[in-house]
A protein has these predicted regions:
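Catalytic cores of secreted/periplasmic lytic hydrolases that degrade extracellular macromolecules
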Residues: 1-124
């Protein structure tokens, strides 16, 4: 586990909570870990974009630094409120809301299991 990125996930979870979305920072961390290939992607390095987030123009969103991304991502999760994000109580609910909202189109079980394998490595 990367403590720096886990702290950022906590920032995102807190920002989401300010907007009525309650998610475990472990879920966010796991999502970012999967999306960045273990925090090694070029997009992460060049755009501080841990989630593969696109702008409305269809290009990758650029963030000045990782804390800016973490703040944005917490607010971004509110876009999935109607897809079930407002009522998540488990990792599966979180993944299902993202899938329903179109965040990813891969098989839901595959994505869920990828995140679960990361969550299970977090020692607390």
């Amino acid at each position: 586990m990367n403590p720096y990125f886990y702290e950022l996930a906590k920032i995102s979870a807190n920002k989401a909570a300010e907007n009525g979305i309650i998610v475990d920072p472990k879920w966010i961390y796991a999502q970012w870990h999967v999306e960045t290939g273990g925090f090694t992607s070029n997009l992460q390095a060049t755009h501080h974009n841990l989630g593969g987030i696109y702008s409305s123009s269809g290009s990758w969103m650029y963030f000045n630094d990782f804390p800016e991304f973490a703040d944005y991502f917490g607010r971004y999760l509110t876009y999935y409120s109607e897809d079930g994000m407002a009522h998540t109580s488990s990792l599966y609910d979180y993944v299902a809301a993202l899938h329903t909202g179109g965040y990813f189109s891969a098989d839901i079980s595959t994505y869920y299991n990828a995140l679960l394998s990361i969550v299970n490595t977090i020692p607390f």
